Amino acid sequence: MNPWINADVLMVKKWTKNLFSLILNAPIEPFFAGQFNKLALYNSNPLNKNKIQRAYSYVNAPSEKNLEIYIVRVLNGQLSNLLYNLHSGDKIFIKKKSFGFFIIDEIPDCEILWMFATGTGIGPYCSILQEGKNINRFNHIILTHAVRYQNELTYLPLMKELRQKYNGKLQIQTITSREKHKNSLNGRIPFLLRNKILEKHVGFSINPQTSHVMLCGNPFMVKDTFLFLKNNRNMEKHLRRKKGHITMENYW
């Protein structure tokens, strides 16, 4: 059984006209960093009231008191627009138990752990790195966040704090695809890998001998990057029953 329970909305942080974070308090069961949950609200149709539900990942570490969920407001998206218009004191539904295996304990030992995210896919990595459990077995972690515009790097201040916390183990790299910015690489992740721009910039190469790659976010990025690594770097999908080099989570 995994019932719906009430979550209290403590705050709605609106970063841009389409990006926002919900700060919630709810008596959910303990979860693992990197997992996701489901949020729901009733639709506004009085003649046919149904719960609209979607899956969203946590940004916060499991040890934190409140939950933080990073969300993109989708054009004509039923739930995301309802969530965007919530206020402190409102209530929403959340599942008692969390879901998913995009967690650090599922990642095999390796020298270099690559964390690739697009958009709100940065959330699970923030949760994992804030929690910090089972991280010492990696010599280097490369956290890469790709967005369209520089102002969409909502959690860059947190990423910089985490870089300081890990004292040389963690490198962060930002990417913008629709504008050029002096502090970010320009392009899309598959393009920057195909041309070895990203690897040259961070000073490490992706290969099956030293690396494990985590992919989270836009399913087109996930698919294209996976196929590039499979076809050009001899890397395979990681499964519980068969050890590989790539762990993936699609965001829609």
Swiss-Prot record:
Q: Which UniProt keywords apply?
A: Cytoplasm, FAD, Flavoprotein, NADP, Nucleotide-binding, Oxidoreductase
Where does this protein reside within or beyond the cell?
Cytoplasm
EC code(s) of this entry: 1.18.1.2, 1.19.1.1
GO terms for biological process, alphabetical: cellular response to oxidative stress; heme catabolic process
Residues reported to bind NADP(+): V147, R148, S177, R178, R188, N218, P219, F220, D224
Q: Which reaction does it catalyse?
A: 2 reduced [2Fe-2S]-[ferredoxin] + NADP(+) + H(+) = 2 oxidized [2Fe-2S]-[ferredoxin] + NADPH; reduced [flavodoxin] + NADP(+) = oxidized [flavodoxin] + NADPH + 2 H(+)
What name does UniProt use for this protein? Flavodoxin/ferredoxin--NADP reductase
Organism annotation: Buchnera aphidicola subsp. Acyrthosiphon pisum (strain APS)
Instruction: Give me the gene this protein comes from.
Output: fpr
